[in-house]
Design a protein with these regions (language model features):
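C-terminal helical "tail/cap" subdomain of flavin- and related membrane-associated enzymes
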Residues: 5-47, 108, 116-119, 124-133, ...
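Conserved N-terminal helical subregion
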Residues: 16-17, 25, 29-46, 89-230, ...
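Conserved mid-domain beta->alpha element of the FAD-binding
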Residues: 48-64, 68, 72, 196-197, ...
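Short, solvent-exposed loop/turn segments at secondary-structure boundaries
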Residues: 81-85, 290-294, 364-367
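Conserved FAD-binding catalytic core of PHBH/FMO-like flavoproteins
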Residues: 157-322
Length: 455
């Protein structure tokens, strides 16, 4: 059953609860009338839980290899959430290209923040002193794609079997060691040989495997407020003059910032350009708790006050926002798959994770999407190994997990250390991003992260 992305308007949480209740009623009624069986009678090879970029890329890779798979998504469509953002893909480009068919890769430019500007073979991410405006470093990078999450998911969803309104409840494993049956809150189930959790940083599947305590992300003493905004043509031209796509700023007062484009609808009409920017700062968990119920107006006022210590483009970009402009605030967190108590039972290779579900990391070094897409490529190869009979399923999945945990777990720790150092002016130049740029690396010792959490 192939399906294109399901269009819908964003729904509030209460609407999702009502929708789930309606789904339960419909499935019970259909079962009574003999029109459906709540259990899928034909097992899929792979069930992917979560229609994010990782899960959809994995599904495309499996489909490309002729391996049956189903993607389930708890929301009622791809665009159910109102917030969109963009992500950097650089060293992970080859992995994404290997997963998708040529006709989709040929359209990758269409999901960039500026679809009108071809991606350069060689580019750089410039870091500025956000108070003085002086350049601090220029980080070289090859093929730096800035991809809009919503458009990327829409592209990757094409031709896939995606079933919406499927919120994970539990997973049951057959006694013969061959199957896993995944049950959903609407009363239906799907049986498969492998279940893959790609349901994001706050993964339900991860908590199913590890419990709500060990399976939750670890809160960090840092937070950020994000903005998307349009401006008048003159103001938009002014804000974009430093760099046409992206730049980073480090403020000696202890703030980190990013500024870039999110959507260039018409390159000749700056009033149609949407900018994407944020400021992050050190915030003890006690402070995060104390301000947990702040209104949008309070969050905006807070970040406007912080921006007064910045130079342009940040200062003007914040000053020009109306007082009722929507912002998104969040505390930073991570999940290290290599940490103590984070080792899950894959039940003989019948369940595993990829992407943020397996290794949620901070974003100031721009590694998350690259590791996630690399997971998808390596997991697709592992599935091909056992599906073709070249390896036992348990061995193939365990080998995938061993490599993924070493690679991405090391980056979780590196990225968290990097976040701490970028918010400490005395340590900025020793930070991983300043020392190593955006190239992948592994760091096996988790002790620095423990110290960061104690701050």
């Amino acid at each position: 059953m192939a399906s294109s992305p399901s269009p819908c308007s964003p729904l509030p949480r209460s609407s999702h609860r009502r929708q789930r209740s309606m789904n339960v009623f419909r499935n019970l009624w259909a079962a009574v009338m003999g029109k459906s069986n709540p259990a899928d009678p034909s097992p899929a090879t792979v069930l992917i839980v979560g229609a994010g970029s990782t899960g959809l890329a994995l599904a495309q890779g499996l489909r490309k290899s002729g391996i049956p798979c189903v993607v389930v998504e708890k929301y009622d469509c791809l665009d159910a959430r109102s917030r969109d953002w963009n992500m950097g893909l650089h060293w992970g480009v080859s992995s994404l290209k290997s997963l998708v068919p040529d006709h989709l890769w040929d359209r990758i430019q269409s999901v960039q923040v500026d679809p009108h500007a071809p991606t350069a073979d060689h580019d750089s991410l410039n870091f500025y002193n956000a108070q003085s405006g002086d350049m601090m470093a220029s980080i070289p990078v090859q093929y730096f794609y800035r991809l809009r999450r919503r458009k990327l998911r829409g592209l990757l969803a094409e031709g896939l079997d995606i079933r919406y309104g499927k919120e994970l409840r539990l997973i049951e494993y057959s006694k013969d060691g061959k199957f896993a049956t995944t049950w959903f809150e609407d009363g239906t189930s799907i049986t498969s040989h492998l279940v893959v959790g790609t349901d994001g940083a706050h993964s339900t599947l991860r908590q199913t495997l590890l419990g709500p305590g060990n399976g939750s992300t670890q809160r960090l003493p840092y937070c950020a407020t994000f903005v998307q905004a349009r401006y008048s043509a003159d103001r938009a031209r002014y804000l974009r003059k430093v760099h046409p796509l992206y730049l980073a700023g480090i403020n000696p007062a202890g703030y980190f910032s990013f500024f870039g484009m999110h959507d260039i609808q018409d390159p000749n009409d700056p009033s149609t350009w949407t900018f994407f920017f944020y400021v992050s700062w050190h915030s003890p968990l006690e402070e995060q708790e104390r301000t947990a119920n702040w209104t949008n107006a309070q969050r905006l006022q807070q970040v406007k006050e912080l921006s007064q210590t910045f130079t342009d483009p940040w200062k003007s970009a914040f000053d020009w926002l109306p007082d009722d402009h929507q912002v998104w605030y969040m505390g930073l967190s991570d999940f290290d798959p290599g940490a103590k108590d984070h080792h899950w039972d894959n039940h003989g290779g019948r369940v595993t994770m990829a992407g943020d579900a397996a290794h949620a990391m901070t974003y100031q070094r721009g590694q998350g999407l690259n590791h996630s897409i690399t997971d998808a490529a390596k997991l697709a190869e592992a599935v091909k190994q056992f599906a073709s009979g070249k390896a036992a399923q348990a061995d193939a999945i365990s080998s995938y997990e061993e490599e993924m945990i070493a690679r991405a777990g090391g980056e979780v720790r590196t990225s968290t250390v990097n976040t701490a150092m970028l918010h400490n002016w005395e340590k900025v130049q020793q930070s991983p991003v300043m020392q190593s740029g955006m190239t992948p690396q592994q760091q096996q010792q988790p002790q620095p992260q423990q110290a960061i959490r104690a701050q």
